[in-house]
């Protein structure tokens, strides 16, 4: 199917000197005359006795070339001297045997055969050109019915189908020669040949203009696109029917003799043999004038044989081979993970590589790795041989190899010499991000395991429990240079995803450093001495050395050394540092000897988080080299100190809180009360379950905190080892600690539901058999999750890489004026992500001034914000900042450096050619895999997050904003709407109305904001003063209440028992509850409130959703604030990335979520208009313009707005997740981008994973690359077609220049899979998914791939257009003059001889 030019083109292809690739449909002439070297007439393969290929068969030497180099079939000509001669006896050309990998043949078919790809791949290309359905075509192609090709003067219609009976009837009526009707490939060929595409195109365009129906227009546009593809290319539609079949070169479908006289063969040979056998049989039958039925059957079998060859199993049952296994057709060769694209073109095995188990190498420098001698000998063999020859130690390669095998002493000397300055690459699978491959200087070691520096383990996610790593040797000077300059471990100490240090001490190292830096535990005053003072650090160190480290006081007792110079490592001392007297400990003074002076004296404890901050600070202040030295010193110090401290954990270190019994008794009492409420019918079973879980969660937290305080206490000036391990961040966390010493707590079932009876034992006390059994439930869920989700996460990463692989930095500055606005991310009053973290390293789009002072500019437009600037902006109290983003970048290809901002891996502005798309995909995909693997570490311990009350964090005035409240009989304010919040503001002596006005216009900033849910009970009045720690509100966690806001009498409307409601007797309590159920009728269940008992004056109505439990009775008198009904929230599920990963996939695939929420289309006020077709009619009315928008909402959905509520465009009206496509249609592109970025971030933030926004923005940018044409105007674009934005603007520009009407379009959101398949490059799309469909599509319209992206260049064997292969870097060569080029060449060869 590839189009090929002259033989010169073939030479260019071999050299790789081409910059584009065109694909088309091959004509019969091309297959026979250009590709083929001869016709195959026999199905034979090789002679069973001689094992030589049969003449004219599938392996014929005359057609394909000799099987042995420079030797013909009969042996008349041997040796290279006869090169190019064609043997006069056997007809074989004397040449290299490798031509058998290149030369093709053909099979001349007895009848035309339809190519299955063009007929079966949806949409059917043949069907669309002919205007026939796929099922009609199928009946014609497989000889079931005739199709009229030329109706002549009969009453038949062209393309009409005739079955056998009808055909005979028509022949009798009109005679055989009055019309032409055929079946099979021949009929399709004739129809396609007779099709006038130009006039068909005009006719389709005309129909498209006249048609009003959207569906018909979409159908026509699809057909038009296919026809247009044929017209605009040099393809002819009849080429979709084959008269010759090309045969793949024999060495690509080998037949290999095995021991015992059997053969291993490629499935293709079997498929070709079937085709040849059937073809030959058909030719014979046709010569013999056989009856039509037999001929027709044979033709159908030939069609099926060719179908199986091209795509086995696409039509009918697949053809089976030995062992009842479907044979692999040509399509299967390309498709999937083991197909040609992914197995051989995108992923190749490499030479000069090895793998071995890894062990820790604490003695290594940061840029080194330990390479076993035997391994190095094998890997560097060619280099050793060259050096041995240069030295004159050996003269032939064979003798050099023997010398190496012997292990001669000079070989080891040469090896030592060679590996100096020759980096090797280490890789650990799975390579989830670019830190999975790094370069190191090899150090030769004994043994067979590779040694790895402890600090790079985090980047590789490696541990030493049997992990293996691969070693690769960069061979060329360029490769070595790239490895040295770009890939060395010291250049990779920060995560590209967040800019945080990845090379940080962990485990023992953290523990040692923390122990050294711990707060003073030995106070001389308490032991009758006085605090020692020292004149400088040197004196402290001298005292330490003199007395030796007295590490643990209880070991030494009160015995100090005779001289009195001994000094405790945690003793409180005074020392003069930089002219100031500081209170510190000898341990801290000792630690500061390795800290770069520019960072100042570190005088505080050092948990792992602070070490990480210190490393970042070090890099910013003193640069990379000093940081790497500091890291090596930290490693050394950490290991030494943790060894000297000899911290180990004993059973007695696990303290059980004394208050445990008391707290448990209290909890059991509370649970009993809840159970009693349930039995009395006050609450439902769901509420009882939820409340019980809340009680136990609270107990869990209480005991956990009690235990932590207990082990924090020091005994005999000694730290609890458990506390040291957890607090330093070396191992374990509070949750595990709680399970060791307090209680295991609530466990989850495999389906995520929480078991309500917790495990009250802890591991120190031991578990009962039942408790152990319950534990294993959750633990197994974790392990199963790990296995299943790893695959999901890997697939997500693959899709992300595919969609973003083309995004590279192509220019410095695109000059756009567009921007996005970012602000602090808060959850309630809690600040989740400060503004400084969101704006650091981003380009500001307009000047930022100090609030109230225009003369003080914090940052100028175009500045890339430094951490100091970002901090200043945050400190100035600025709410939001306008920054440039890849979402708004206007670069024609890729994105510009200014819109991207800093490269987080090194803190510099991103460089040209950097593959930011792949970095983004890896940054999002990598933690996904990490998290799925990390699920089981909680051992199924329920991790639910909820708080039943709101407490003021500071003093201030409480202001209600956008809240509708009603005062109940107890004087509490109950919240009636969902969208409001409580604000805590500074007491400035203003009136309440002033505060409200200032808050709504954002003129003042609140000290804290608390969004409140429907039904929340506010305990403080609007405008009242509150003090820190005061309870402000109680939140209803278990139900969504429906509260009455006016007094009156209850009247049930449409609450018909047995239809819209049912009485359910509670099994445990025997009490009967009235529950609203789902129903199909025209009923609208609601409670109406009347002012009087006669039900004359209506005061208000309240819609009751299905599933709600009615809490009032017909005719009951009620007061404001009373509960009318309650909707249980359902059982609380545990929060886990198990829910999170599918959520990320759902967002980036732009899928419609289940139970999607309805959102308001305009700003306005909510009203209801009754019911229609089992749906509630909700109206949003704009009070100013009078415009109305109707929403039909299912009765089963829970409304979160009520009549009279003001809503804004895009606000949720019902519970659930929002459909992203609706946000795009209603609120526009900017809002959608913001929504997607925030939603993806929320999933990762919940798991404590830090990913920079810019990575998610790149993926979102790729999802919004296309627009959908709504009016083509005078352009060549089609209605309903999805085109690239750039293409759309370009086409419009051309049309406007010619005076035509431009096209209209709307932005469209595509999921990442669809976006990947819609890429400009057909090679890239074909290697991703749907290979056959992509290639069929590309071939029909003769697409050209300009090889601009990464994947297509890798597949074609070119250098990738990124990094050092980026265009501008490659162009440097053009400026070198010829002499200089020669010089460079000479230098290279010199260099090679030195390196060799």
From Swiss-Prot:
Root EC class: transferase
Residues binding Zn(2+) 1: 72, 74, 87, 90
Cofactor note: Binds 1 Mg(2+) ion per subunit.
Entry cofactors: Mg(2+); Zn(2+)
Residues engaged in binding Zn(2+) 2: 814, 889, 896, 899
Catalytic activity from the UniProt record: RNA(n) + a ribonucleoside 5'-triphosphate = RNA(n+1) + diphosphate
UniProt cross-references to Pfam families, sorted A to Z: RNA_pol_Rpb1_1 (PF04997), RNA_pol_Rpb1_2 (PF00623), RNA_pol_Rpb1_3 (PF04983), RNA_pol_Rpb1_4 (PF05000), RNA_pol_Rpb1_5 (PF04998)
Keyword Nucleotidyltransferase carried by entry: yes
GO annotation, cellular component aspect: DNA-directed RNA polymerase complex
Keyword Transferase: yes
Single biological process term from Gene Ontology: DNA-templated transcription
Quaternary assembly: The RNAP catalytic core consists of 2 alpha, 1 beta, 1 beta' and 1 omega subunit. When a sigma factor is associated with the core the holoenzyme is formed, which can initiate transcription.
Family: Belongs to the RNA polymerase beta' chain family.
NCBIfam families xrefs: rpoC_TIGR
Entry protein name: DNA-directed RNA polymerase subunit beta'
Organism: Chlamydia trachomatis serovar L2b (strain UCH-1/proctitis)
Highest classification ranks of the organism: Bacteria, Pseudomonadati, Chlamydiota, Chlamydiia, Chlamydiales
């Amino acid at each position: 199917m590839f189009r090929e030019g002259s033989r010169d083109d073939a030479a260019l292809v071999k050299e790789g000197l081409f910059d584009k690739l065109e694909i088309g449909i091959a004509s019969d002439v091309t297959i026979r005359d250009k590709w083929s070297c001869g016709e195959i007439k026999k199905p034979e393969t090789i002679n069973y006795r001689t094992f030589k290929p049969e003449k004219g068969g599938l392996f014929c030497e005359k057609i394909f070339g000799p099987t042995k180099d420079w030797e013909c079939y009969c042996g008349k000509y041997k040796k290279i001297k006869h090169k190019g001669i064609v043997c006069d006896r056997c007809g074989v050309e004397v040449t290299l045997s490798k031509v058998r990998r290149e030369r093709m043949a053909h099979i001349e078919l007895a009848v035309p055969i339809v190519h299955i790809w063009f007929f079966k791949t949806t949409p059917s290309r043949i069907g669309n050109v002919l205007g026939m359905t796929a099922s009609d075509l199928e009946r014609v192609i497989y000889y079931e019915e005739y199709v009229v090709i030329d109706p002549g003067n009969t009453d038949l219609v062209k393309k009409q189908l005739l079955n056998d009976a009808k055909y005979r009837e028509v022949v009798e009526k009109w005679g055989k020669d009055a019309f032409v009707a055929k079946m099979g490939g021949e009929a399709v060929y004739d129809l396609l040949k007779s099709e006038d595409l130009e006039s068909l195109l005009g006719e389709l365009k005309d129909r498209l203009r006249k048609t009003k129906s959207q569906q018909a227009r979409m159908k026509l546009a699809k057909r038009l696109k296919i026809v247009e593809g044929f017209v605009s290319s040099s393809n002819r539609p009849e080429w979709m029917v084959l008269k010759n079949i090309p045969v793949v070169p024999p060495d690509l479908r080998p037949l290999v003799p095995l021991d015992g006289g059997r053969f291993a063969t490629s499935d293709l040979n079997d498929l070709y043999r079937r085709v040849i056998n059937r073809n030959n049989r058909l030719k014979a039958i046709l010569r013999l004038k056989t009856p039509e039925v037999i001929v027709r059957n044979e033709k159908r079998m030939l069609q099926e044989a060719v179908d199986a060859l091209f795509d086995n199993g696409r039509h009918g049952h697949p053809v089976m081979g030995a062992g009842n296994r479907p044979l692999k057709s040509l399509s299967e060769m390309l498709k999937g993970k083991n197909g040609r694209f992914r197995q051989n073109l995108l992923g190749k095995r490499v030479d000069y590589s090895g793998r071995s188990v890894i062990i820790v190498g604490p003695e290594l420098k940061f840029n080194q790795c330990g390479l076993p001698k035997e391994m190095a000998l094998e890997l560097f063999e060619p280099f050793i041989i060259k050096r041995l020859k240069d030295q004159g130690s050996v003269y032939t390669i064979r003798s050099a190899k023997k010398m190496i095998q012997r292990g001669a002493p000079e070989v080891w000397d040469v090896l030592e010499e060679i590996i100096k300055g020759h980096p090797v690459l280490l890789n650990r699978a799975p390579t989830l991000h670019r830190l999975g491959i790094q370069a190191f200087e090899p150090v030769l070691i004994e043994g067979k395991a590779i040694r790895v520096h402890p600090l790079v383990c985090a980047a590789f996610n490696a541990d030493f429990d049997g992990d293996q790593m691969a070693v690769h040797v960069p061979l060329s000077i360029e490769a070595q240079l790239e490895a040295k300059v770009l890939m060395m471990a010291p250049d990779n100490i920060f995560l590209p995803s967040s800019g945080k240090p990845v090379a940080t001490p962990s485990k023992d190292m953290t523990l040692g450093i923390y122990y050294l830096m711990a707060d003073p535990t030995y106070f001389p005053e308490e032991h009758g001495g006085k605090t020692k003072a020292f004149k400088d650090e040197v004196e402290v160190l001298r005292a330490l050395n003199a007395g030796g480290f007295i590490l643990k006081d209880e070991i030494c007792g009160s015995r100090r050394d005779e001289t009195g110079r001994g000094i405790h490592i945690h003793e409180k001392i005074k020392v003069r540092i930089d002219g100031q007297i500081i209170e510190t400990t000898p341990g801290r003074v000792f630690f500061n000897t390795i800290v770069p002076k520019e960072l100042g004296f570190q005088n505080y404890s050092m948990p792992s988080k602070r070490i990480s901050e210190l490393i970042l600070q070090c890099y910013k202040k003193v640069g990379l080299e000093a940081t790497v030295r500091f890291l090596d010193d930290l490693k050394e110090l950490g290991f030494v100190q943790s060894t000297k401290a000899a911290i180990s954990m004993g059973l007695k270190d696990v303290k059980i809180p004394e208050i445990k019994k008391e707290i448990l008794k209290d909890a059991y009492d509370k649970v009993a009360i809840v159970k009693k409420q349930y039995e009395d019918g006050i609450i439902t079973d769901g509420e009882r379950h939820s409340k019980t879980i809340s009680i136990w969660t609270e107990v869990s937290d209480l005991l956990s905190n009690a235990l932590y305080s207990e082990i924090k206490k020091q005994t005999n000036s000694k730290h609890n080892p458990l506390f040291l391990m957890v607090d330093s961040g070396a191992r374990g966390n509070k949750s595990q600690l709680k399970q060791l010493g307090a209680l295991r707590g609530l466990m989850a079932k495999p389906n995520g539901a929480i078991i309500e009876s917790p495990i009250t034992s802890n591991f120190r006390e031991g578990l009962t058999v039942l408790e152990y059994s319950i534990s294993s439930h959750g633990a197994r869920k974790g392990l199963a999750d790990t296995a299943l989700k790893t695959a999901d996460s890997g697939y997500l990463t693959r899709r992300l890489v595919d969609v973003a692989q083309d995004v590279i930095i192509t220019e410095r500055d695109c000059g756009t004026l567009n921007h996005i606005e970012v602000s602090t991310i808060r959850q309630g009053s809690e600040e989740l992500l400060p503004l400084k973290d969101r704006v650091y390293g981003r380009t500001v789009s307009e000047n930022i001034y100090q609030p109230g002072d225009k003369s003080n500019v914090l940052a100028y437009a175009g500045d890339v914000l430094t951490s100091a600037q970002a901090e200043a902006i945050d400190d100035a109290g600025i709410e939001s900042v306008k920054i440039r983003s890849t979402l708004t970048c206007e670069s024609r290809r890729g994105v510009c450096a200014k819109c991207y901002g800093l490269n987080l891996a090194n803190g510099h502005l991103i460089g040209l050619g950097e593959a930011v798309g792949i970095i983004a995909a890896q940054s999002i995909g990598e933690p996904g895999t990490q998290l799925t693997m990390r699920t089981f570490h909680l051992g199924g311990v329920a991790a639910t997050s909820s708080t039943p009350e709101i407490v003021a964090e500071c003093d201030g005035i409480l202001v209600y904003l956008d809240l509708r409240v009603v005062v109940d009989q107890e004087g509490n304010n109950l919240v009636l709407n969902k969208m409001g919040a409580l604000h805590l503001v500074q007491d400035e002596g203003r009136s309440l109305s002033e505060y409200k006005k200032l808050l709504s216009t954002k003129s003042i900033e609140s000290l804290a904001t608390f969004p409140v849910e429907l039904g929340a009970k506010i305990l403080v009045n609007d405008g009242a003063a509150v003090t820190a720690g005061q309870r402000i509100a109680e939140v209803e966690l278990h139900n969504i209440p429906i509260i009455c806001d006016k007094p009156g009498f209850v009247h049930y409307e449409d609450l018909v028992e047995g239809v819209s409601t049912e009485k359910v007797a509670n099994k445990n309590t025997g009490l009967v509850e009235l529950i609203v159920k789902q129903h199909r009728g025209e009923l609208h269940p609601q409670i109406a409130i009347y002012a009087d008992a006669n039900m004359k004056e209506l005061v208000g109505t309240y819609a009751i959703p299905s599933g709600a439990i009615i809490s009032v009775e017909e005719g009951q008198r009620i007061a404001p604030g009373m509960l009318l009904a309650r909707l249980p929230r359902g059982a609380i599920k545990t929060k886990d990335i198990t829910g999170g990963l599918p959520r990320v996939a759902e967002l980036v695939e732009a899928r419609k979520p289940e139970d999607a929420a309805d959102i308001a289309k305009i700003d306005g006020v909510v009203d209801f208009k009754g019911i229609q077709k089992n749906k509630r009619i909700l109206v949003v009315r704009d009070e100013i313009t009078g415009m109305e928008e109707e929403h039909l909402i299912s009765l089963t959905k829970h409304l979160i707005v009520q009549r009279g509520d003001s809503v804004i465009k895009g606000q949720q009206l019902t519970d659930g997740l929002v459909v992203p496509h609706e946000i795009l249609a209603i609120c526009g592109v900017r809002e959608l981008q913001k929504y997607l970025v925030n939603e993806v971030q929320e999933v990762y933030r919940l798991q404590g994973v830090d990913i920079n926004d810019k990575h998610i923005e790149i993926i979102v940018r790729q999802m919004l690359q296309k627009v959908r044409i709504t009016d083509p105007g005078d352009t060549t674009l089609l209605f309903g077609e999805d085109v690239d934005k750039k293409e759309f603007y370009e086409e419009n520009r051309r049309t406007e220049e010619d005076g035509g009407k431009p096209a209209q379009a709307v932005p469209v959101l595509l999921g990442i899979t669809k976006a990947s398949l819609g890429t400009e490059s057909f090679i890239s799309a074909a290697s991703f998914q749907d290979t056959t469909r992509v290639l069929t599509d590309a071939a029909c319209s003769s697409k050209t791939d300009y090889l601009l992206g990464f994947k297509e260049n890798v597949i074609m064997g070119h250098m990738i257009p990124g990094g050092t292969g980026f265009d501008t870097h490659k162009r440097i060569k053009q400026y070198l003059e010829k002499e200089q080029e020669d010089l460079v060449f000479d230098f290279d060869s010199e260099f090679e001889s030195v390196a060799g």
